[in-house]
A protein has these predicted regions:
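Non-catalytic RNA-recognition surface used by pseudouridine synthases
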Residues: 1-129
């Protein structure tokens, strides 16, 4: 009952500020190989305050966007099931960051581990400025 329509100008202002937001995601992912706590530790160390480059293709044009990953933690849930907590800049395409998006996101979790990682669930836990 407390919902109201958003004006287009308000939506445009919010989208323009998306880079300023810090978003915390919880990602449940399935890996191609079994994953260990050492893999999680190496990801945690590698992705602390790391820039991630994303490429977007629109016809012949290729756009490049740089985003920050501030923190990456995780825990092994099963043999090939892992849960990641990722704190990053608001404009990061999180699914592409996890699976690599066919080389369009570099570095990615799958590229760093050296095997396929497929996100199953993505939840937003927190959004802050």
């Amino acid at each position: 009952d407390n919902l109201s329509r958003a004006r287009a100008s308000a939506v445009d202002r919010m989208k323009a500020r998306i880079r300023d937001y810090v978003i915390t995601y919880r990602v449940l992912a399935i890996t191609a190989n079994s994953i260990t706590d050492e893999n999680i530790k190496s990801l945690h160390d590698y992705f602390r305050n790391r820039q991630v480059v994303q490429l977007f293709r629109r016809g012949r044009r290729v756009r490049r966007r740089v985003s920050m990953v501030y923190e990456l933690d995780g825990r092994v849930v099963g043999d090939r099931l892992v849960e990641f907590l990722i704190k990053c800049q608001g404009n990061l395409y999180i699914r592409g960051f996890v699976h690599g998006s066919y080389g369009n996101v570099e570095p990615s979790i799958a590229g760093t581990l050296g095997f396929s990682v497929r996100p199953v669930e993505v939840d937003i836990l927190n959004i802050s400025d």
